[in-house]
Regions:
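Catalytic core of Fe(II)/2-oxoglutarate
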Residues: 145-233
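Intrinsically disordered, low-complexity peptide-like regions
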Residues: 3, 37-40, 108-110, 174-175, ...
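Non-heme Fe(II)/2-oxoglutarate
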Residues: 1-87
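Generic structural motif
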Residues: 16, 99-102, 125-127, 178, ...
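Residues at beta-strand starts and edge strands
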Residues: 4-9, 116-118, 190-194
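A structural signal for short, well-ordered beta-strand segments and their strand-loop junctions
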Residues: 39, 90-95, 119-123, 132-134, ...
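A generic structural signal for short, solvent-exposed coil/turn residues
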Residues: 86-88, 114, 124-125, 176, ...
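Catalytic core of non-heme Fe(II) oxygenases with the double-stranded beta-helix
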Residues: 92-95, 99-168
Length: 233
C-alpha cells in the first residue's frame, strides 16, 4: 500500500495545541479578504459564493508568513509542520478554511490544488456526513486536470460516494487529490469548523519516505475509518 491507494485516513499525530479560537477567527476575517496572493490556485474567485463554503485566508504563502501569523499563533505555526513530522521550512503554503457561519448544505465537488493532501481540523463541530468523497475511475499517479473544481457530476469519477469518518473534533488527516474529488457538506449551519491545508510540498512522487510511511501506518491503524481506492465495479 502507498498513499496513492488511500483516499482518506486520519493521521496518527500529536494533539492540536490550545489556541485562542476567537482571535484566530478574527485574524482570518480581517486578513483573508484583503490578501493579494500571487498565482493563487484556490477557487474562491471562480465559484459562485453560494457554493463556496469558506472564509479563506493564507497564513503562509511562498514560504513567507502573512500578517504576523507566526507571531500571533506560534503554537499553531509550529504544529502545522510538526504534526506530519516535517520541518517548518518544508511547508511553503498554509491555507486556513473556516466554514462560513451562514453556509448550509452541499458545496462544490473538486480536488484541491496540492498533491500531498495534508489536512487538519483545528475544530469541527459538524462531523457527521460532512466530508464526502468520490473516487476517480482511473488510478492516477499525478493530479488530473479533469477533476479541478468540478461542479455537479463528472464522467471521470465513479458513481460511488463515501462519507469520511471524522474520529475527533480536532483531527489531522490525509485527503487524496489524485484519485478522488471531495465536497464539504454543512449539516449544522453556524457550527464551528476550521480546516487547514498544509501545502507547497511538491508532487506526490517526491513525497518524503517518512511522510509516506506515516500516511500508510495511519491508514492501517485507523482501518475502520480509512477509505481506499478500488476500481469501479
Amino acid at each position: 500500500m502507498t498513499p496513492l491507494d488511500i483516499l482518506y485516513t486520519p493521521i496518527d499525530a500529536p494533539a492540536v495545541p490550545k489556541f485562542e479560537i476567537d482571535k484566530f477567527i478574527n485574524w482570518c476575517k480581517n486578513n483573508g479578504p484583503v490578501q493579494d496572493i500571487f498565482n493563487r490556485k484556490d477557487a474562491s474567485k471562480q465559484i459562485d459564493p453560494k457554493l463556496y463554503p469558506w472564509n479563506i485566508a493564507y497564513a503562509k504563502t511562498a514560504g513567507r508568513w502573512q500578517s504576523d501569523f507566526c507571531e500571533q499563533f506560534p503554537e499553531l505555526a509550529d504544529y502545522f509542520s510538526q504534526a506530519f513530522g516535517l520541518n517548518e521550512k518544508d511547508v511553503l503554503e498554509i491555507i486556513l478554511l473556516p466554514v462560513k457561519s451562514e453556509f448550509a448544505g452541499l458545496g462544490f465537488w473538486h480536488s484541491d490544488p496540492d498533491e500531498n493532501g495534508l489536512r487538519m481540523y483545528l475544530e469541527n463541530q459538524d462531523t457527521e456526513d460532512s466530508l464526502l468523497i468520490r473516487p476517480t475511475k482511473e488510478p492516477h499517479t499525478s493530479r488530473p486536470n479533469v477533476v479541478v473544481n468540478r461542479q455537479g457530476t463528472s464522467s471521470h469519477v465513479q458513481d460511488k460516494e463515501y462519507s469520511a469518518k471524522i474520529i475527533s473534533n480536532q483531527q489531522v488527516f490525509f485527503l487524496n487529490n489524485l484519485r478522488a474529488i471531495h465536497a464539504v457538506k454543512t449539516n449544522k449551519p453556524g457550527a464551528l469548523r476550521i480546516a487547514v491545508i498544509i501545502g507547497g510540498l511538491g508532487s506526490m512522487q517526491t513525497m518524503k519516505p517518512e511522510l509516506k510511511d506515516l500516511i500508510v501506518r495511519s491508514a492501517q491503524k485507523y482501518s475502520d475509518a480509512a477509505i481506499l481506492w478500488t476500481p469501479e465495479q
